[in-house]
């Protein structure tokens, strides 16, 4: 249960976030427990997470802001283990380095910055850039199909996620046939379609010449007979 100080501080920070949101981040407390916050990070552009939607939690101690929160990410990202406490300088792994003047917005900005770095930490995983991009494409499907807490905390995003998923599927369906029909013609097929390079066309040309010669000789004899 939150102390009066923690409750007052977290409510103040929530109102501040509503007034001045953090770029690429949405965050709010659970209605039944102000110490349990849920965040959504929108994958920053020009990163392997672009277009992704990453849901996670901040679990604050009852005596916040004097101690830092536990930070977890629920949506698979290829960057962090899911549902695992992350070792960050502003998380509960490092209470001695925590500064009580830091706020929820400070934590969220730091989390986005760390996520897009290559720094290794407890709770982090190492994957390729292509793997992270693959995860990013699947985040919205995961959140509405395999993440019940997301449905509770962010119901306003459900329909939008479904629309985005349907749109992505439609675009993929359009791209695949184009790729199939754009298969280049092989050199052998090109040669088959070049009439003057085929043996059959050469034979036809020889027969045409022979016929012309025959008619020329016949005409010569005909006119010679008349003379």
From Swiss-Prot:
The active site is at residue 87. It is an enzyme of class 2 (transferase). It is found in: Endoplasmic reticulum membrane. GO terms for cellular component: endoplasmic reticulum; endoplasmic reticulum membrane; nucleus. The keyword Membrane applies. Residues 5-163 form the UBC core domain. Its main location: endoplasmic reticulum. It catalyses: S-ubiquitinyl-[E1 ubiquitin-activating enzyme]-L-cysteine + [E2 ubiquitin-conjugating enzyme]-L-cysteine = [E1 ubiquitin-activating enzyme]-L-cysteine + S-ubiquitinyl-[E2 ubiquitin-conjugating enzyme]-L-cysteine. Keywords: ATP-binding, Endoplasmic reticulum, Membrane, Nucleotide-binding, Transferase, Transmembrane, Transmembrane helix, Ubl conjugation pathway. One of its GO terms (biological process) is ERAD pathway. It comes from the Eukaryota. Its EC number is 2.3.2.23. Pathway: Protein modification; protein ubiquitination. GO terms for molecular function: ATP binding; ubiquitin conjugating enzyme activity. SUPFAM superfamilies: UBC-like (SSF54495). Residues 1-206 are cytoplasmic. Belongs to the ubiquitin-conjugating enzyme family. Catalyzes the covalent attachment of ubiquitin to other proteins. Functions in degradation of misfolded or regulated proteins localized in the endoplasmic reticulum (ER) lumen or membrane via the ubiquitin-proteasome system. Cognate E2 conjugating enzyme for the doa10 ubiquitin ligase complex, which is part of the ERAD-C pathway responsible for the rapid degradation of membrane proteins with misfolded cytoplasmic domains. This is Ubiquitin-conjugating enzyme E2 6. It comes from Schizosaccharomyces pombe (strain 972 / ATCC 24843). The lineage of its organism: Eukaryota, Fungi, Dikarya, Ascomycota, Taphrinomycotina.
């Amino acid at each position: 249960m939150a102390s009066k100080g923690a409750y007052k501080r977290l409510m103040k920070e929530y109102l501040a976030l509503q007034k001045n949101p953090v770029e690429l981040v949405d965050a709010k407390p659970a209605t039944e427990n102000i110490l349990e916050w849920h965040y959504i990070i929108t994958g920053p552009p020009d990163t392997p997470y672009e277009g992704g939607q990453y849901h996670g939690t901040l679990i604050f101690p009852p005596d916040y802001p004097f101690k830092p929160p536990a930070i977890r990410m629920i949506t698979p990202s290829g960057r962090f283990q899911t549902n695992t406490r992350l070792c960050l300088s502003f998380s509960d792994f490092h209470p001695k380095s925590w500064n009580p003047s830091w706020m929820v917005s400070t934590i969220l900005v730091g989390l986005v910055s760390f996520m897009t770095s290559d720094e290794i930490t407890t709770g982090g995983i190492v994957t390729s850039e292509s793997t992270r991009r693959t995860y990013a494409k699947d985040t919205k499907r995961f959140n509405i199909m395999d993440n019940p807490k997301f449905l509770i905390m962010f119901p306003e995003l459900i329909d939008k996620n479904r629309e985005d998923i349907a749109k992505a599927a439609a675009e993929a369906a359009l791209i695949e046939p184009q790729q199939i029909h754009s298969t280049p013609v092989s050199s052998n097929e090109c040669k088959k379609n070049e009439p003057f390079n085929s043996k059959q066309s050469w034979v036809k040309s020889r027969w045409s010449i022979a016929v012309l010669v025959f008619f020329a000789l016949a005409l010569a004899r005909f006119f010679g007979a008349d003379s």
